Curated annotation (Swiss-Prot):
Family, as annotated: Belongs to the TDA2 family.
Organism: Saccharomyces cerevisiae (strain ATCC 204508 / S288c) (Baker's yeast)
Disruption phenotype: Leads to cell death when overexpressing the camptothecin mimetic TOP1-T(722)A mutant.
Keywords of this entry: Acetylation, Cell projection, Cytoplasm
Positions where N-acetylserine occurs in the chain: S2
Protein name: Topoisomerase I damage affected protein 2
Gene name of the encoded protein: TDA2
Note: Present with 799 molecules/cell in log phase SD medium.
Cell location: Cytoplasm; Cell projection
One CC-aspect GO term: cytoplasm
Predominant localisation class: cytoplasm
GO biological process: negative regulation of actin filament polymerization; negative regulation of barbed-end actin filament capping
Amino acid sequence: MSMQIEIKDGRSDNSPLPERKLVTLIQESYDSLKDDNEINLSTESTSNLLIKLVLEKLEKHSSLYKYIASVTTLNIEGLNEENANFSLKNDIGASWESKKDGIFNYKLEDKNNNECYLITILWLHK
């Protein structure tokens, strides 16, 4: 499976998990979706299933936080270096305690399925 994970700007220094572990958690969740023969990804929303798996894993890791996960899906079929004509902007704001709460952003590409997932995870200390 050809996947690339790219970490984007975010405030993850106070994360309940180390940054590398967050990436692994997301990658494993995505891979388990792709490997599960009982899930029909043509009829089920990949992003909704991915959010569910990620949140379940985060909740198992620490119950001291509330978690929010967001996935934006881009279909990148037909895009190449000469024809990369799309623009996407996403802003998010929150009111929180910066020493305990934070945000992590990353990009997950599945070139086999011509999709790109822009994933944001927020954690709020209870």
